[in-house]
Amino acid sequence: MKLKEVTEGKVRIFVPDPTGYMVEGKFDPSWAPVFYNPKMTFNRDLSVIVVSILKPKIIVDALSATGIRGIRYYVESWKSEQLILNDKNPNATSLIQINAKNNGIENAKIYNKDANALLYEVKSDYIDIDPFGSPAPFILSSLNAATRNGIVAFTATDLSPLEGSSPTSCRRKYDAINHKLSSSKELGLRVLIGKIIREAAILEKTVYPLFSFYADYYYRLFVRVENGARKADDNINKHLKYFGECPRCGFQTFVEENCKTKCPVCGEIFSIIGPLYIGPLYSMEFLKRIMDLYSNFNYLTSFNRIQKLLNVIEKEARFKNVFYNISKLASKLKISAIPPIESILECLGDASRTHFAPTGIRTDKEYEEITKCIKSLR
């Protein structure tokens, strides 16, 4: 295997040299013998900050590839009592051994196993699931491996089913009815959380989001796992619903059931998706801890981007409603010239931008107030 050394954060690791695996002058990370995607540096950078707050005793990186994620956690976040790095690809585990040793990690436990098999053998207070594609095949096993109040982190790059572009795939992987709606960038994350909650309930556990975000072409989500059938039931009853959007006027709301429901504004039948999670996407207490700490990581190459994202999330996190996509809403209202987002925010008063979409606005104000502002500013 042809290798090259790269620096990410405070570690240096060997990865497959892209020049040795190009096809017609192009390269995709999946073509290399071991997967390494530099485009996920932002994901790993922000995760390093989160793990530094959590300070877990046992870190399990179940799909390690080069080992970059787990190694960075150990070097930059927190020297956990135990670091478990696993990949079913023997080329990957050989590379992990080299990379761990080169970064001064002598006590890492390195496994060459199927991730699900490993996760049914271990218990951990921090498990990271960062697959190539959907995390769905690893949800149940990772929740099973989580100790009481443990954390499981998920990355999902299969946005097509989650955002409703591939409804049949979403039904198959996430057991949810889905199709493209105006706020699908956020709704996809809620569909994912809904699936995780239902899987946890099988084990008489439940989960609550600590921190989550959308970036580039993926979702990243950190959930706290709690034990108890009653907690599982309560979370399902309180936070698993459906979402309806009016295809005519753009009114949107959470609804109890997947049945024909008329829009209260114009009488059109809602487009409905779900089940999905309707609760908060962030723990406000944990978000404050991130905001207090992240400046200590100003050496990160993506620090400015992290700062920008966190500043937006801090503002939008206090609102309960799904964001309104002003571009899509204006189109439904037959308004061709969209007013500046800042002007709409000023008109509404209690509102913010959202990191999910550049033309999105998050507010708990009523639909009528939002449309009134849009119409008055055109």
From Swiss-Prot:
Residues where S-adenosyl-L-methionine binds: R44, R69, D87, D114, A115
Protein's UniProt name: tRNA (guanine(26)-N(2))-dimethyltransferase
NCBIfam families (alphabetical): PRK04338.1-7, TRM1
Swiss-Prot/TrEMBL keywords: Metal-binding, Methyltransferase, RNA-binding, S-adenosyl-L-methionine, Transferase, tRNA processing, tRNA-binding, Zinc
Residue span(s) of domain Trm1 methyltransferase: 4-374
SUPFAM superfamilies documented for this protein: S-adenosyl-L-methionine-dependent methyltransferases
GO biological process terms held by the UniProt record: tRNA N2-guanine methylation
PANTHER family for this protein: N 2 ,N 2 -DIMETHYLGUANOSINE TRNA METHYLTRANSFERASE, TRNA (GUANINE(26)-N(2))-DIMETHYLTRANSFERASE
Protein family according to the UniProt entry: Belongs to the class I-like SAM-binding methyltransferase superfamily. Trm1 family.
